[in-house]
Amino acid sequence: MIQHDNGVFHLKTQNYSYLFRVSAHGTLEHLHFGLPLRTEDADAFLCRSGLGWGSCVVLDDDDPGSCLDDKALEWSGCARGDYRESPLELGGLPSDLRYVSYRILEGTAPMESGLPQARDGGETLEIILEQPGAQLKLYYTAFPTTLTRRAVLVNTGDGILPLTKCMSFSLDLPGSYTMVTFNGGWIAETHREDTPVGPAKVVNESLTGASSNRHNPGFLLARTGANEDSGVVYGFNLVYSGNHYASAQRSLQGLTRVMQGVNMSNFRRELAPGEAFETPEAVMAWSDGGFNGLSLAMHRFVNDHIIPAYWRGRPRPVLYNSWEGCMFDFNQHRLVDLADRAVDLGCELFVLDDGWFGQRNHDKAGLGDYNVNKKKLPQGMEGLADKIRAKGLQFGLWFEPESVNPDSDLYRAHPDWALTDSFPHVLGRHQLLLDLRKPEVRDYLVENVGSLLDKAKISYVKWDMNRHSIALGAAAHDFVLGLYDVLERIFAPRPQVLLESCSSGGNRFDLGMLCYSPQVWCSDDTDPIERLDIQGGLSYLYPQSTFGAHVSADPHAQTLRHTPLATRANVSYFGCLGYELDLKHLLPVEIRQVKAQTAFYKQYREVFQYGTFRRTETGWQVSHGGITLAGVFHRLVHAAPGYEQLRVQGLNREDLYSVTSLEQALRVGQFGGLLKHVVPVNVDPNGALLRIADRRFSLKNGVQTMTLSGSALESGIMLLPLFRGTGYREDQRTLGDFGSDIFIIENCNPGSF
C-alpha cells in the first residue's frame, strides 16, 4: 500500500514502513525505514536543524533550517549546500532537482532500456523532480518483504546533457552501522567481511565488467549489536550484472548516507534532447530479527519476484556434470558409460561440459564455433542426446557464448566482432570477449544457441563466461545490456530450459543473471570446507535454491584437501545437488553412499531447496512443512573434544519432534594401523587386506534418535560424544577433520504447522 498525505509518502506492507516527505523547498527528506508505522507518526522522525550548524550553505537565507548538509535526504544534487557524496553528477554542471509531482501506479512500472527487473510488484510510486533542462523520475515499488528503487534521468533541454554519474538510489539513515560485504576472488568467492562505517567512506565496487567474484553487489548495514538472530539489519542489492558501485559514510550529525548503482568510473553519456538514462533496479530490505531475519526477507523476494516464473518453487534435478571427471578428454562411448553410471546412482540430468565443439581439445581454441566435433561425437549432438534420454536422464549442455578464441573459425571470419581497443589484444584464458553491443553478434548467438537447443531437445544450459572485460564506462554498461538482450531472446521462448549461469564460478552471481537463470554456479571450488564460507556468504542475500553445489573427487583440485564423501554431500545438500567426478573410479562402498545420498536428497528436496534457511552456531538449517534439516559442520578436530550442543530455531515450543541423525558411513581405512588394537590379527596399514576392506566395508557412526519438545531443541540438546582417542564405539561420532552430521527433525503433531 502506498499513501500520500500532506506531503508525506508512505510505502507500507505487513513487514515494513518506508516514509519520506517533500520539504517546503521541494527537496525529499527521508523519515523512516523499518517497523510498520502510522502515517501520522511521520513528524516524529524529522531531522530538525534548529539554528543549524556553523559553516552551512542554505537554500533560503531567511530559513536557517534550509541547509541540506544536515538533512536525511532521499536524493541530493551538487553545489546546493550538501557536501556529502552526490548520487548524480552532470559532467561538472550543478544539479538542483526539486519536487514537481507524483503518481501511484498499479503493479511494476516497466523498464524501457532492456534492463531486467523484479516482477509482480504491488504498487509503484513515481516521483518527478525537475530543474531547467533535466527531469529525474524516482521509482519506488513495494514488495511484501522488500522495496525496489531506481532512477530515470531525462534531458528536457535543447542541448546535450552530459551524464557522468547516476545512482539507482541514495538514502540517509540515522545511526551507526557496520558495512558487511562479500569479497574474494576466483575459487574463493563471497567471504564475509565487516567494516565499521565512519567519517571515511566505505566502498564496495567492481570494475571487471561483471558483478565480479571480488565484490558481490549485495551488502548489509548492521546496526551496532546486531547478530544472526536479533538486531536491526538493512540489506541492499542490485538487479545488474556489470560494474557496480556502493558506498556508505557517516556524517558529523550521525546520518549514514548509502547509495548504489552502476559504477560510473570512466563513464560519460551525452544525452541528446529527449534522451533518457535508466539505472538498474536496487533492492532494499529491513529486519529487526538480525542477519537471519534479513536473509529471510531477501530469500522470499528472490524466489517470488526475481526467479523466472516457470521455475519458481519448481524442484531442481540432481545432475551429473562431466567437467571435473573428463575435462576435454571424452568421446561418445565414455559419455554414455558415465550416463549409465549416473542414472544408476540416482542422477536425473546429465550435463556435457566444455569440449564438444570445433577443435576444442584444450582451452586455446574453438570458442565461438558451434559445429559439433564429430570425432568425439560421431552421431552429433542429437544422437548423443537421444542416447542419454533413452536412459531416463535429461540432457544438458555447456556453452560459453560471450567469448571467442583467436584460434577459431568465427574469429578468422569476423575479427571485428571481438571486443577490442586501439592497443594490442590482452587475453584472458586465451580468449577475447565478443562485442555484444553489435546487433549482428547478438543475432549470431541467438540463432546458433537457440537452434542447437531445439535440435537436441536440451533441458538445461550451463552458460559460462571465463574472462574479465576491457570495456570501460558506458561501453561496459552497453555490453551488459547486449547480454540481457541475448538471454531474453534465447530463453523467453524456451522457459522450460533450466539455465545455470556460471562465470569462472561465482564471478557473476547477481540478481540480474537470476532474472534469467534460476540457479548459478557458486564457485569453481568444490571443496566443501571452502564452500562453507562461499555458500555461507551467499546465503545472506540469496536463497539456497539458486546455489549450484556439487560433490567432487577427493583430494580436491582446488586445495588438495581430503574430505569425507559424507561431508561433500552434506554441504551440497544445502543447494541444488550435483556430482562432478569420474564415476568409474568410485569404490563399491562409495557407490552405496552416493545412492543413499541422492535418495535422501530427493526425499527432502523441497526442504533443502525452498525451506527457510538459517545460519546457526554449528552450521546451517532449513525448515519447511514441519520438517527441519540441520547441518553440523566441523573443520579441524582437537584432542579431547568437549560436549557439543545442537540448537534448532523456528520450532513450535510446545510441539514434540522426532530427531534422527542421518546414518553415515565410517571408512575402515580411516583408522589405518590403529585397527591392530581392536581386531585379532596384526593389520598392515599399507597392506592389501586393509585396502580391500576399505573399498568394500564401512562402520556405523553414531546414529542418534530421540523425541523432544521444541523448547528442548531451541535450548540446545547434547549430541553424542566425539572420538576422543580412547577407542571406537557405535554410539560415538567418529568424524575426524572436516566431518559433519545432518539431523532430521520432524514435527510429531500433524496439522500444527
Language model segments and positions:
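Active-site neighborhood of glycoside hydrolase catalytic domains
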Residues: 373-380, 412-566, 570-591
